[in-house]
Amino acid sequence: MTALVAYRNLWRAANIAFQGDAPVLAAARQQIRDNFREKSTLPANDPTIQPMIEKAEEVAKFLRHNLVQGQPQGNDSFKLRIHKDTERGDNDSIKTAGQGKSSGGCCQG
């Protein structure tokens, strides 16, 4: 994957994650821009480039799948903006907590 592809993926993920929140979206875009510009002078064969590209992809994936924004609705409640890319867990590990034996661990063998 190239740096340009990672940049575009990160930009798109920020657009999805921060849609409707102009100040945060602007700050995210500026941060993306600044970080990529700062590294733009590195030679193409620099060994540090690939790990940075992978990190950008991880951040894009996190923004797209795991970040949910909420707006206060009063009475200590929030309205969450969950979109089509938001990862939804089934909470199986929570439902079965405390039922049965441990699968290992330090002292519960």
Curated annotation (Swiss-Prot):
BP terms from Gene Ontology: mitochondrial respiratory chain complex III assembly
The entry's keywords: Chaperone, Mitochondrion, Transit peptide
Source domain of life: Eukaryota
Compartment(s) where it occurs, according to its Swiss-Prot or TrEMBL record: Mitochondrion matrix
Disulfide bonds: none
One cellular component (GO) term of this entry: mitochondrial matrix
Compositional bias (Basic and acidic residues): 83-93
Any one GO molecular-function label of the UniProt entry: protein folding chaperone
Region of interest (Disordered), residue spans: 68-109
Cited InterPro entries: Complex1_LYR_LYRM7, MZM1/LYRM7
Subunit structure: Interacts with RIP1.
Family classification: Belongs to the complex I LYR family. MZM1 subfamily.
Described function: Assembly factor required for Rieske Fe-S protein RIP1 incorporation into the cytochrome b-c1 (CIII) complex. Functions as a chaperone, binding to this subunit within the mitochondrial matrix and stabilizing it prior to its translocation and insertion into the late CIII dimeric intermediate within the mitochondrial inner membrane. Modulates the mitochondrial matrix zinc pool.
Protein name: Mitochondrial zinc maintenance protein 1, mitochondrial
Taxonomic lineage of the native organism: Eukaryota, Fungi, Dikarya, Ascomycota, Pezizomycotina
